[in-house]
Amino acid sequence: MSERESLNSQLEHLQMRYVGTGHADISKHEWLTNQHRDSLSSFIGHSSFLSLFSIAENESVGRVRYNTLTKMISPCGPAPKIKDNTMDKEEKND
């Protein structure tokens, strides 16, 4: 197996195993959501970030952690509506 095929198979394995590693058909919204969730989880994992944010927001560290966790549910808002082209074609034929 050539080096290129090996790299492609390793990439496919990572994409199947871990959420957020992306794929060829990923949408912009999905990619941004993964980026925001990665950042927010990093903030939660580092206590110095939580301390900094708690001082800046004048909140307790626990409250900042809770607020950050709730932001992770939908960090970029709802997904945009996808326009279905098949309905447009059917409407034009009628």
From Swiss-Prot:
Disordered, as annotated region: 75-94
Record has Nucleus as a keyword: yes
Keyword Nucleus: yes
Family to which the UniProt record says this protein belongs: Belongs to the SF3B5 family.
Biased amino acid composition, Basic and acidic residues: 81-94
Location (main, coarse): nucleus
Cellular location(s): Nucleus
Function: Involved in pre-mRNA splicing as a component of the splicing factor SF3B complex, a constituent of the spliceosome. SF3B complex is required for 'A' complex assembly formed by the stable binding of U2 snRNP to the branchpoint sequence (BPS) in pre-mRNA. Sequence independent binding of SF3A/SF3B complex upstream of the branch site is essential, it may anchor U2 snRNP to the pre-mRNA.
Taxon lineage: Eukaryota, Amoebozoa, Evosea, Eumycetozoa, Dictyostelia
GO CC annotation: nucleus; precatalytic spliceosome; U2 snRNP; U2-type precatalytic spliceosome
Name the record gives this protein: Splicing factor 3B subunit 5
GO-annotated biological processes: mRNA splicing, via spliceosome
Source organism of this protein record: Dictyostelium discoideum
Database matches in InterPro entries: SF3b5/RDS3-10 (IPR009846), Splicing_factor_3B_subunit_5 (IPR017089)
Record's keyword terms, sorted: mRNA processing, mRNA splicing, Nucleus, Spliceosome
Assembly and binders: Component of the spliceosome B complex. Component of splicing factor SF3B complex which is composed of at least eight subunits. SF3B associates with the splicing factor SF3A and a 12S RNA unit to form the U2 small nuclear ribonucleoproteins complex (U2 snRNP).
